[in-house]
Amino acid sequence: MYHGHAKRRFGRTHEHRKAMFANMSQALIKHEQIVTTLPKAKDLRPIVEKLVTLGKRGDLHARRQAIAQIKDVALVGKLFEVLGPRYKDRHGGYLRVLKAGFRYGDNAPMAVIEFVDRDVTAKGKDSGPVLNAAGEEEAA
């Protein structure tokens, strides 16, 4: 019996769901705003908020925990050098989810998930290489 309904499954296996949220976390950290379906945005928010809290801690163990989850060292650098210091005085609530109408084709409810005090220049077509806190390009 399917008791509880604690988490949404999105019609995917556990591994696929974990990879999907890791990829969405990477996109959100890189662009600071993404458009996705409303249920995915609602489930993504606590995942990324925990990553930002790790970025605020800033120690080696927190960095290794973040690398284990999002698997991109350049984005972990942005998380710890840019996002962590940006939200050092804020206790949670780093993200907002805004409803964005319905998708053409299947009428799925869409949402925009973004950082609260986001950098509007971070969003773009590809936004190029990831920049560190000083604005220089990271060596990959």
Swiss-Prot record:
Under the heading InterPro entries, the entry gives: Ribosomal_bL17, Ribosomal_bL17_CS, Ribosomal_bL17_sf
Biological process, per Gene Ontology: translation
| First and last residue of the signal peptide | none
The record's listing under SUPFAM superfamilies reads:
Prokaryotic ribosomal protein L17
Name one matching Pfam family: Ribosomal_L17
Supply the alphabetized keyword list: Ribonucleoprotein, Ribosomal protein
Record GO terms (molecular function): structural constituent of ribosome
Give the matching Gene3D superfamilies: Ribosomal protein L17 (3.90.1030.10)
Q: Which GO terms describe its cellular component?
A: cytosolic large ribosomal subunit
Oligomer and partners: Part of the 50S ribosomal subunit. Contacts protein L32.
Q: Which family does it belong to?
A: Belongs to the bacterial ribosomal protein bL17 family.
Protein known as: Large ribosomal subunit protein bL17
The species this protein was found in: Beijerinckia indica subsp. indica (strain ATCC 9039 / DSM 1715 / NCIMB 8712)
What are the leading ranks of the lineage? Answer: Bacteria, Pseudomonadati, Pseudomonadota, Alphaproteobacteria, Hyphomicrobiales
